[in-house]
Design a protein with these regions (language model features):
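Conserved N-terminal phosphate-binding loop of PLP-dependent enzymes in the Aspartate aminotransferase
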Residues: 529-961
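A cross-family kinase active-site recognition segment
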Residues: 94, 124-182, 204-206, 290, ...
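An alpha-helical support segment within catalytic cores of ATP-dependent transferases
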Residues: 13-24, 151-152, 169-211, 221-224, ...
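Active-site activation/catalytic loop segments of kinase-like enzymes and analogous catalytic loops
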Residues: 244-278, 292-310
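Zn2+-dependent peptidoglycan hydrolase active-site motif and core
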Residues: 419-420, 434-465
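ATP/Mg2+ or Mg2+-diphosphate-binding catalytic cores
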Residues: 4, 8, 175-176, 298-351, ...
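A conserved alpha-helical element in kinase catalytic cores
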Residues: 58-107, 125, 130-134
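Acidic, glycine-rich catalytic/binding loops that coordinate metals and/or anionic ligands
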Residues: 349-380, 469-472, 482-541
């Protein structure tokens, strides 16, 4: 069969400005500034006319008139329907024709005028979030569905950009590629893709498709700072083709936005497409070969066009971009891609052929060979030393052990990953044997045994390697090399071109192209390990949602499964490491050895309820009161902050006889009935206004950034509202006033100078008591102040604390005066089952010890200033940063859409948090409008982690979210 593209050369039209101006004026009555728009083989010009913007399309004479008629008909077909996306419309010329003809330099061209769609091409954005990728797939599928009943003779044509003809395009134009090695590789890989497609072609559905839903043809509107695809332009590639090819074209165009992970780009586009127009298993099987085909034919086409138009900037950029995309696609193992894409839409991943049965053990095993746990949750990993070699060594017997395939593992530094092979540990010098027959070669430091047409055995960690063309089972390949942890790594790889690292992200799909070498490793047969599915975290989330109340929220839409913490880092089940910027519960850091030791010791001795008499309860209470000013000398021990604030409310009622409480607007104090009543945060208590009991009296939020009062007298002016309520209630009718000394729920907003002093004076003058809620902001987190109330230079009547008091072990406290405390006795005794338990108090004392010994309050000053300075510098470049609140390591980055109106950037904040999680930083929004990034990491955070946070925030704000 002849190649329809052999010898076909299609240079773009190049009409000069004067001619274009005449066409617009004479035929369409349009005039104004012109701007050339890029195109591979047509000429497109935008005119900014007084009546609006329009696109003049000068079509290449190499394309059929019938095809142009089909394009116009398709645009009108869609424009006349209630489709969920925007499309351009063709406009008639002075003669009433939708297609006109002009002649330039002896060549006749078809010309059309179409409406211009407002927005920005998707191509102009760097980073594209998974939600945007899925939306792009949704748009492509929505267009295909809307065209499904469209028919026109012009749909049936042979087109260079039809992915069905990619092989012919590569054959016709590969000669334009000057890089001989690159050309040969491209031709070879294209042939492999075509071979796979030939076997599937009969199962691939054909339908009318736009076939060019690419980033240059998709127009977006801004939605919460994200590009949101909502329009499609340029119907130049419209034809009847494979539906699966439509997906491939849509996906390949976006790979340039994420060259380091092309597979996830295609998976997300597929997910969006499949939700509208479901693909079959055969179509999903064909998708990666189609991706390869599109990438290869794009390179060949661009290189050929460059020969025709060597000075065209659009073509030059296309060549560079197409090569980058090709190289990214080229690195993805095909089996991995098929497996990931199948699982993305709920199809079973294809099964690999079974590896050959081992005919010889890999080594001569001793009698006892333990299985070694190197998982994220391995008990042998010391959180202090983080010596992963020692964690393995402690499990070995006489230096022997066997590792696990498909296991999520930690790394000594940075991210871990999932193991693509397994290893055995053995004394140095142990001979390593070929388990099966095969050909052997050395590749770098590895020995590679080619077993059959599917499998390669890759062995690392050997010395004295013996390489021969063929080996029989039992042939010595080398010996275990000397090293800190001697052993050999075995990987069974079903891919001839790539060998994966030992640890990879699960999303890479490498577990679909490798197998467990268990049978070839173990001293006795054991079943191959089946790794957890790639969507394991999502499955666990489904189980969580099925068994837990919906009100019990979780971070993130698709949260990682976190199973380990160390210091200021969190680790998911696959070994991915995250900088933890939100965990003020573990104030010392995760897995603190002193807290672990104290809790373990106490658990071995005693843990019981607080009615028993034991030393830890007294010792912790004495230490706590020593940290507080007089006359705060009497302690109630509880378990949580909500419980602490509930006790504080009871103390107020018992001591004053009044139930009336003043609380600050938009604050949060807990989830119990009483504390919920005094919490008016919109996010935490959206029904506060309608459900507020009569004894709760809300005063103006003393927020000098968002509130009505600013300047040096703001504290007094906000306190006027406290005085107003006190006056309305009257002396003797005021129970108390509760406030966080630093406005934690608003993101660490510092109260105006003098506010608490004035508010406390007004309340006390009326016979009321003042509660400082230090649950979030106290305990040294502010750096310069151990307690938040110190920053306001006041002493409360009651202080509540919890959350960080036991570094994650439930323990909280209410501290007041002896006189106030004794008033509660008149109502009966006080008891909290686990409040002040021996274990809780042991953890709390260990926490106080470490705060002092490790200088963590001073670290909060230093690192907090570093973060604030870095964010303030970013604010000079990014107006979305309205201000930086707080002190020490209780900070809030308030995001706004307008620095004058302070319109909250709520959706942007959530998108930024999602993007930062992808980049390895855990941060969350807070505040009434959920537009403040809360920065309250463990106080052990160091400069490197703070800089990582700043770097990730910089990238996110620069490249998008």
């Amino acid at each position: 069969m002849s190649n329809p593209f052999a010898g076909l050369q299609i240079p773009s039209p190049d009409l000069d400005v004067e001619h274009v101006t005449r066409i617009l004026s004479d035929r369409y009555g349009k005039a104004g500034p012109l701007r050339a728009l890029g195109s591979h083989q047509d000429q497109n010009v935008m005119v900014d006319d007084a009546s609006g913007r329009f696109i003049l399309k000068i079509s290449n004479p190499g394309f059929s008139h019938e095809g142009l008629l089909a394009q116009n008909a398709a645009m009108l077909h869609l424009a006349q329907r209630d489709v969920p996306f925007r499309v351009p419309r063709p406009l008639p010329d002075a003669d009433g024709e939708l297609i006109g003809k002009v002649t330039d330099a002896g060549t006749t061209y078809d010309v059309r005028l179409v409406t211009f769609l407002d927005g920005t091409p998707l191509a102009e954005f760097d980073y594209l979030a998974p939600t945007v990728l899925r939306r792009h797939g949704w748009l492509a599928a929505s267009v295909a569905v809307a065209l499904s009943d469209f028919d026109h003779p012009g749909l049936d044509r042979t087109l260079q950009w039809d992915v069905r003809h990619a092989s012919d395009v590569v054959k016709a134009y590969a000669g334009a590629i000057s890089d001989e090695a690159g050309r040969d590789d491209l031709v070879l890989v294209m042939a492999r893709a075509q071979s796979l497609l030939d076997g599937l072609a009969d199962q691939l559905r054909i339908a009318p498709c736009h076939a060019d839903v690419t980033d240059v043809n998709v127009v977006v509107q801004a939605r919460a700072g994200q590009p949101w695809p909502d329009a499609i332009i340029d119907f130049g590639d419209l034809l009847r083709t494979w539906i699966a090819g439509d997906v491939a074209v849509a996906g390949v165009s976006l790979i340039a936005h994420s060259l380091d992970d092309p597979l996830s780009v295609i998976a997300n586009v597929l997910r969006g497409y499949h939700g509208v127009l479901p693909l079959t298993e055969s179509e999903v099987a064909a998708l990666w070969p189609l991706v390869v085909s599109r990438a290869a034919s794009s390179v060949a086409s661009s290189e050929n066009q460059l020969l025709l138009e060597p000075d065209d900037e659009y073509v030059i950029r296309s060549v560079e971009d197409d090569w980058r995309v090709w190289r990214a696609v080229r690195e993805v193992p095909w089996r991995s891609a098929h497996g990931v894409l199948a699982e993305t839409v709920g199809f079973p991943a294809p099964k690999l052929p079974l590896p050959p049965v081992a005919q010889s053990p890999a080594v001569k095993w001793p009698a006892v060979v333990p299985s070694v746990d190197q998982s994220v949750t391995a008990d042998t990993v010391d959180p202090t030393s983080w010596n992963l070699h020692e964690a393995v060594r402690s499990q070995l017997v006489d230096g022997w052990g066997v590792g696990q395939y498909g296991e999520g593992r930690l790394s000594a530094v940075g991210d871990g990953g999932v193991s693509t092979g397994a290893e055995f540990f053995a004394p140095a010098g142990t001979p390593v044997l070929a388990p099966v027959a095969g050909s052997v070669e050395q590749q770098g430091d590895d020995v590679v045994v080619t077993v059959d047409d599917t499998w390669r055995l890759v062995i690392g960690g050997l010395s004295d390697v013996i390489v021969g063309s063929e080996v029989a089972p039992g042939t010595q390949l080398g010996v275990v090399a000397e090293g800190e942890l001697p052993g050999a790594r075995l990987q069974l790889v079903a891919d001839y071109e790539h060998t994966p690292p030992m640890l990879v992200p699960r999303s890479s799909g490498w577990l679909h192209a490798t197998a467990d070498p268990a049978e070839w490793l173990a001293p006795e047969p054991r079943p191959a390990r089946v790794p957890e599915p790639s969507d394991e975290a999502a499955r666990l989330l489904q189980r969580r949602n099925a068994v837990l109340a919906r009100a019990q929220e979780h971070y993130y839409e698709e949260p990682p499964r976190i199973e380990r913490g160390r210091g200021h880092f969190l680790f998911d089940v696959d070994g991915r490491r995250y900088v933890d910027m939100v965990n003020n519960v573990t104030i010392l850091g995760h897995s603190h050895p002193a807290v672990e030791a104290a809790v373990s010791r106490q658990l071995r001795l005693l843990n019981t309820n607080s009615r028993f008499h034991y030393g830890a309860m007294v010792e912790f209470s004495e230490r706590l009161t020593a940290l507080l000013p007089d006359p705060l000398d009497t302690v109630f021990l509880v378990s949580t902050g909500s419980e602490a604030n509930e006790v504080a409310l009871r103390l107020v009622r018992a001591a004053t006889g009044s139930h009336n409480m003043l609380a600050v607007r938009s604050a949060y104090h807990g989830w119990t009935t009483g504390t919920d009543a005094i919490s008016t945060s919109i996010a935490d208590n959206p029904g506060a206004a309608s459900s507020r009991p009569s004894w709760v009296h809300i005063v103006e939020s003393p927020n000098p950034y968002r509130g009505p009062f600013k300047g040096p007298d703001a504290g007094e002016r906000y306190a006027d509202d406290v005085r107003r309520v006190v006056t309305e209630l009257g002396a003797g009718n005021v129970g108390g006033f509760i406030a966080e000394p630093v406005y934690g729920n608003a993101g660490g907003v510092l109260l105006p100078d003098g506010y608490l002093r004035a508010a406390y004076d007004a309340v006390r003058d009326a016979g009321g008591l003042c509660i400082a809620d230090e649950v979030q902001v106290g305990y040294g987190r502010l750096g310069d102040y151990f307690w938040g109330f110190d920053q306001q230079d006041v002493v409360p009547d009651i202080v509540t604390m919890a959350k960080c008091t036991g570094n994650g072990i439930p323990v909280g406290a209410v501290v007041t005066t002896r006189d106030i405390a004794d008033r509660l006795l008149e109502e009966g005794s006080f008891f909290s089952s686990m409040g002040g338990s021996p274990v809780g108090c042991a953890a709390a004392m260990a926490t106080l010890d470490a705060l002092e010994a490790e200088g963590l309050q001073q670290n909060a000053v230093r690192i907090g200033a570093r973060i604030a300075d870095g964010v303030n510098a970013l604010a000079e470049q990014h107006p979305i940063i309205g201000t930086v609140h707080g002190l020490g390591l209780y900070r809030g980055i308030e995001l706004v859409r307008d620095r004058e109106t302070l319109e909250p950037a709520s959706e942007e904040a959530m998108g930024i948090c999602e993007r930062m999680r992808e980049l390895g930083v855990i941060v969350q929004p807070t505040g009434d409008y959920m537009n403040v990034l809360k920065i309250k990491p463990p106080l052990c955070i160091d400069e490197a982690a703070a800089d990582t946070f700043l770097d990730v925030l910089t990238v996110t704000l620069r490249d998008g979210w």
